[in-house]
């Protein structure tokens, strides 16, 4: 299938290549020149979080994240330049996104698209270009339906059987059942157990703000190793290879979601300097996240 041809070379390296290309297309669609688009693509693809999820085997999540910018590129190109060609790119990319089979990431992507479309609607009303907006939206809606249709063999069984899983609720629940299961599916605490805590937000800018990974290797020059040796702890060399350095709210983690100080600085600078409705769309969805 076309989807399988998206990955060039051995995996997971091919996932990163797809991430670079995808974000490069998004920046081009937004009118950024080629050189800056290359730099932006590298910054997005080399984000520390991408390597963490690859390390722990979240391949479908990585692919879904890699395809997000390509989907957005289609939407942006449709509303900014050529509606039909943008919708075609959007349709193909969204079909691939759904095929990646990570509904959580696709749901977040849908929130971003919705925010962007609302921003375009506000702009269309302000600039009195509502007919063009409606035309483009029809193309995008049709592409969405076709993209979902190409994955109906995956979506339909998931929807049908989700009612019998721990995430879809069950009629077999005991009257006084406790824990994570509720009659309507999983409770909020369980569903958000691996979500970033508010106090962890500085990790985006400051690496290891809430510590590192739940199992990190420390140096023999560290104070921890020195104390272990002084205390006569046996096999201290082995102990420091699996030290818990994370103190955030999650049960455990492979490391912080560090986005890069320069990237975060440029993001904030863009929110201050740039004009237009797209800026407020990005700011709003970032606060919601």
What are these regions (language model features)?
Residues 1-2, 43, 287-289:
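Conserved oxyanion/phosphate-binding beta-strand-loop segments in alpha/beta enzyme cores
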Residues 14-30, 35-123, 136-158:
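Membrane-embedded helix bundles of polyisoprenyl
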């Amino acid at each position: 299938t076309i989807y399988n041809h998206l990955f060039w070379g051995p995996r997971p390296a091919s996932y990163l290549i797809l991430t670079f290309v995808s974000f490069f297309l998004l920046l081009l669609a937004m009118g950024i020149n080629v050189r800056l688009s290359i730099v932006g693509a590298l910054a997005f693809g080399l984000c520390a979080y991408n390597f963490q999820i690859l390390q722990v085997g979240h391949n479908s999540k990585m692919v879904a994240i890699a395809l997000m910018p390509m989907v957005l590129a289609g939407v942006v190109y449709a509303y900014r330049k050529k509606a039909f060609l943008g919708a075609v790119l959007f349709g193909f990319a969204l079909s691939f996104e759904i095929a990646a089979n990570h509904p959580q990431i696709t749901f977040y992507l849908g929130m971003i698209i919705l925010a962007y479309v609302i921003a375009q609607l506000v702009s269309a009303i302000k600039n009195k270009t509502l007919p063009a907006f409606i035309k483009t939206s029809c193309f995008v809606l049709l592409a969405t339906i076709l993209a979902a249709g190409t994955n109906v063999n995956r979506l339909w069984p998931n929807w049908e059987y989700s009612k019998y899983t721990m995430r879809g609720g069950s009629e077999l629940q005991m009257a006084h059942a406790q824990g994570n299961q509720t009659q309507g599916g999983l409770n909020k605490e369980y569903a958000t157990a691996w979500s970033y805590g508010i106090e962890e937000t500085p990790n985006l800018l400051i690496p290891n703000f809430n510590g590192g990974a739940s199992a990190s290797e420390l140096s023999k020059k560290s104070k921890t190793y020195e104390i272990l040796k002084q205390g006569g702890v046996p096999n201290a060399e082995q102990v420091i290879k699996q030290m818990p350095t994370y103190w955030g709210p999650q049960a455990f983690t492979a490391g912080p979601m560090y986005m890069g100080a320069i990237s975060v600085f440029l993001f904030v600078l863009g929110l201050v300097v740039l004009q237009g409705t797209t800026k407020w769309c990005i700011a709003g969805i970032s606060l919601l996240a």
